[in-house]
Amino acid sequence: MRFSDSIEAGIYEPWRDKYMNYPELKHLLKTEEEAPSWGENDESKFVSVMDAQLEKVYAFHLEILKELNESVDWVKSKVSASQEPDGPPISKEEAIKLLERLDSCTETVKKLEKYTRLNLTGFFKIVKKHDKLYPGYSLRPVFQVRLRACPLGSVQFNPLLAEIFSLYNTLRDGLSAPSNSVQVKPKHEHNVDYNSSMYRRRTFRFWVHPDNVMEVKTYIMRHLPVLYYSGKQGFDKDQNGVSGILDPISTCLYLDNSNFDLYSQNLERSEQAYSLRLHWYGKLTPKTDIIVERMVRQGSTLSHSEDRFTIREKKVRELLSGRYDFRKVEDDHSTTASDQKKKLIEDVEQLIVDNHLQPVLRSVYTRTAFQIPGDDEVRINLDSDWVMIREDSLDIERPCRDPEDWHRHDIDDADFPYKHLRKGEYSRFPYSVLEIRECVRYDEDEPLWISELRNSHLISEIDGFSKYEHGVAILFEKYVSLLPMWVFSMDQDIRKDLQEVYSHPEGSAGSRNVYIKRRNQRVLKQNMTPEPSQPSPLVNRLKANEMHPVSEEPEDNREVYRNEHGDHFNFRSIPGLLKPSTYGSFKHHGKTFVTPPHIKKPEIPLRVSGPIKVEAKVWLANERTFLKWLHVVVLLGSLALALYNSAGERLGQAFGVVYTLLAIFIGFYAWKLHAKRSQMIKSRSPAPMTDYWGPLIVGTALAISLIVNMSFALKDAVYQNLIEPDRLLVKLFT
C-alpha cells in the first residue's frame, strides 16, 4: 500500500483539516512529470508550504494536548479535594462521570498519538522523496532544524497516561462494581510463596506493531499500574512513584564464546541451557550497579530459573577473568553474605572460565513495566526501540570491542538510534516486544482481560522468542549454523485484520475467541450489578462482531441418531474401511461409553481450539506427494511409449495409447490435488487433507488395464499357436 493511501485510511474524520496535505506536497515535487525541472523558485515554494503544514500540525497538537491536561487536572482536583479530611466525598454517580471523562481522555490520547505519528512519518517521507528527486537541494538538514522548533518527535505520552490511569484506579477502587482487573492485595498477602507447587508460572512473548503500541498500553493500564524505577537503581521499585523514572533505558550485555555454545544450547532446547548476561539501567558510569543474571531454561518451554547478584562496574573485569574476590564485596556493602550467594558467584565464575565466555551482544531498549508492587501474580513488560549491537572481538583485525575491555565505550554515552555505528554492527528491531509473566494457582484460570489481550488483533504471539537468540541470528549469521524459526517470518506483516480475527470462526484464533466470548458473557451475567460500569474495549469488539455459532444440538439427539443409523451400511462409509483404525472402529461398534459427570463435551474441536500454525514440513510433504505422483506418470508414460513402438504390433500400439491417456489423467489429478492442498495450507483450513478416492480410482484403473492387456496378450498368443490352450495354465504357473 502506498503511503498516500495509508494516510488517507488512517485519518480521523473530525480532524481531517488538521492533517498535513501530503498529496499537495507530492504534487509540488512534480512527481507526475517524466523529466521535471527544479529551480530556486520551486524550492522556495515547496519549503514554505511544507513549513506552513508543519506549523499547522504542531499547533493543533499543542491545542489538543492542552485540552487533555486541563481535563486531567480538573479530575485530579476533584479527586484530591475528596481525599482531604474535610473534603466532600465523591458520590457513585460523580465517580462514574469522572471515569467516563478519563476514558474520553484516554481515547483522545490514542487518537493524538496516531495523528502525531502519521503526520511525522509523512513529513519524513516527503523530505526523503524530495532529496531523492533533487539531490542538489538537500532538505533534510533544514527539516531537522525545523523539528527542533516544532518537536513532534520528542513528545512522550506515557507520563500523561500514567497520571490518567492512576486517577482511573483511584476512582474505580471506590466503586463497588466488580472488575476483571488484578486486584491490589493486602500487605499480609504480599509474602505469598509463588514458588510452591500450588502455583504455575507461564511466560508469553508477543510482537507488537508500532501502530498498536499505544492501544496496548492503554488497555494494560486499565488493569495494572505502571512501575516507576528509582533514580539510583533500576531494579529498586519506587513504591509511591512520585519522583521515579517511568520508562528507563535498559541494557543487557550477553556472554558467549566464539562457538556460540550457549546460543546453540538454548536454540536446541537442551535440558539445561544456560544464559548469562550483565544488566543495568540508564547510562553506564563507574558507580553503576551491574546485575549479573544467570538463567537456566528447563526444556522446550519459556520457563526458566533465574539467579542474580549485584556488583560494581569496576569489578566486572575481575569477574570475567575469574579473579573476583567475594570477601571484598562483603566489606564494600558491610553485610554478611550468605553461603547461597557465595556459591552462586562461584558457579557463575566457573561457568565463565570453563566455557571461555566473553561479551558478544548488547541489547538496548526502553522498558515499560506494569505490575502491582509486591505482587508477582501478573507482570507485563513492553520493550520498545530495541537495538541489537555487536560487542564481540571475534574479528582480530577489526574487533568491535577492545579485547582487553569488557564493553564498548563508544556506545555508553550514545543515544538511540546509534547512527554513528557501522553497517552490520547493529540492527534495529521493527516491533515492540510484549512479555506476559503470570503465576496463578493450578485450580484457577488466568484473568479474563489477559485472555482477551492474548487473543486480540493487537499482538502476535511468537513461540519461544528470545532477544539473545534473535540478536545472534541477525548479527552473527555466518558464525552459527542454526537459526530460530521466527527469523524467516520477519518480512511478513504481523498486523491482523480486525474483522477476520473477531468474525471468522475458522481463523487462526477465531474458534478460541468464540469460547472466550461465551465465557465472558457468563461471567458478566454472574457479576452484573445495577450500577453502570465501563466495559473494556476488547469486550466491546467481541460483542460488536457477531460470530457464527457453534452447533448446540443436544447430545441426546445425536445419540438417538447413532443408535438408529449406526447398523446401516452405505457406500459413503467405504473410505472409513481404509483408515488405519478400522479394527478399533469395528471392535467398539455399537458400544456407548459413559464419561464421568465432571467431563463435558468441548464446545469446539480440540484440533482447532488454538492457533493453527503451518510448519515448513507441511509444504514439503505436499510437494513430495506431487513428485511421487509425477514419478508414477513418468513410469507409465515410458511403458506406453515402449508399447507403442513395439515392432508395429497393433495390440501394443492400442494399449500404448490407453496407458498414455491414463498417464495424462493421473498427471491432471496430481496437479489438481496439489493445488487444492496448497490452497488449504495457505488459508490454514482445519479441514482434513486426506483423499481416499483418488488413489483407489487410479489403482483400480491401472489394475484393470494391466489385466485386460494380459488377457489380450494371452489370447493373441493362443490364436497364433504360440501357446497350446491345454497347456496355458502350465505356462502361467511355471
Curated annotation (Swiss-Prot):
Q: Which Pfam families match?
A: DUF202, VTC
The record's Gene Ontology biological-process terms are: energy reserve metabolic process; polyphosphate biosynthetic process; polyphosphate import into vacuole; vacuolar transport
Q: Which Gene Ontology cellular-component terms appear in the entry?
A: endoplasmic reticulum; fungal-type vacuole membrane; vacuolar transporter chaperone complex
The topology of this chain with respect to the membrane is:
Multi-pass membrane protein
State the source organism's domain of life. Eukaryota
Could you tell me which residue ranges are on the Vacuolar side of the membrane? 646-650, 715-734
The principal location of this protein is: membrane
Residues annotated as domain SPX: 1-144
Feature type site, description Important for inositol polyphosphate binding: 22, 26
Where would one find the signal peptide in this protein? none
Which terms are listed as keywords in the entry? Chaperone, Membrane, Phosphoprotein, Transmembrane, Transmembrane helix, Vacuole
The free-text domain remark for this protein reads:
The SPX domain has very high affinity for inositol polyphosphates. SPX domains may integrate inositol pyrophosphates (PP-InsP)-dependent signaling to adapt cytosolic phosphate concentrations to different metabolic situations.
Describe its function: Accessory subunit of the vacuolar transporter chaperone (VTC) complex. The VTC complex acts as a vacuolar polyphosphate polymerase that catalyzes the synthesis of inorganic polyphosphate (polyP) via transfer of phosphate from ATP to a growing polyP chain, releasing ADP. VTC exposes its catalytic domain vtc4 to the cytosol, where the growing polyP chain winds through a tunnel-shaped pocket, integrating cytoplasmic polymer synthesis with polyP membrane translocation.
Instruction: Describe the subunit structure.
Output: The VTC core complex is an integral membrane heterooligomer composed of at least the catalytic subunit vtc4 and the accessory subunits vtc1 and vtc2. vtc1 is a small membrane protein without hydrophilic domain. Vtc2 and vtc4 are related and have 2 hydrophilic domains that face the cytosol, an N-terminal SPX domain and the central core domain. The central core in vtc4 is the catalytic domain.
Cite the PANTHER family for this sequence: VACUOLAR TRANSPORTER CHAPERONE 1-RELATED, VACUOLAR TRANSPORTER CHAPERONE 3 COMPLEX SUBUNIT 3-RELATED
Family, according to the entry, reads as follows: Belongs to the VTC2/3 family.
> What name has this protein been given in UniProt?
Vacuolar transporter chaperone complex subunit 2
Give the species this sequence originates from.
Schizosaccharomyces pombe (strain 972 / ATCC 24843)
